[in-house]
């Protein structure tokens, strides 16, 4: 049995991205963005996704990049619409027309990994029992909090429901690395100051907080803050920013301390932001960016 360095679990999403310049269709899903970013470290990466059988073609580009892929069948895939009405990359309106069937602890049967990253999109996709299974095996657990605080509203729009997250204490007590963005962090803590918000979240259990915002990322680890800017030559690929960032951070963190992992994640995310869809750059290009900056 292969032991992977990092297993990334999350639903495939069929994304419609709407900008003032036009509409594009993208194969999305946090697992997709995160896995391709993580593979740039050269580690052994496993991507586990749930989707409708008609969408299994998403596995092709991942396998071509050297990522092992497991596709689990669902009655439907998640269909998401992401609308960016202005030039502000953090101003967006999200809605869904269908939601994938949830994952289960048994989906990890036979999976051996040093670390597991859960990139759920909507509450209910990844149950607490799944996270407990990861921790029971002694693996490092990272999650993106969006998949626990976002719910589908009556009109199909995605909304934050931090107050209604009843399993918050149970989840955060299990997590080693927590990914959030500035909007989610404020919803969870009431703090607009990202450093205060990161410290507040760390006090609830996670050893490390990875917080993205429009200008870069902040990592709070070991009582210290580390930062890296996002400096794309042109902003063309906002969707998947956080997934790319956490995938690159967690994978690099398995090899290096927080400061180095933060710089690496900032570089990978910068290059991803220059193009729509998952990152299609090489590790050499990431290193070249770091040398220049």
What does each of the following model-derived ranges do?
Residues 1-3, 162-169, 195-293:
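Conserved phosphate-binding/catalytic region of the ribokinase-like
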Residues 119-196, 216:
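Conserved beta-alpha-beta core of the PfkB/ribokinase-like small-molecule kinase fold
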Residues 36, 80-83, 217-220:
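Short beta-strand scaffold segments in enzyme catalytic cores
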Residues 21-26, 156-160, 232-233:
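Short glycine-enriched, charge-decorated loop/helix-capping segments at active-site entrances
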Residues 3-6, 14-25, 40-120, 124-140, ...:
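Conserved N-terminal subdomain of the carbohydrate kinase-like
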Residues 35-44, 251-254:
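Alpha-helix C-terminal capping segments
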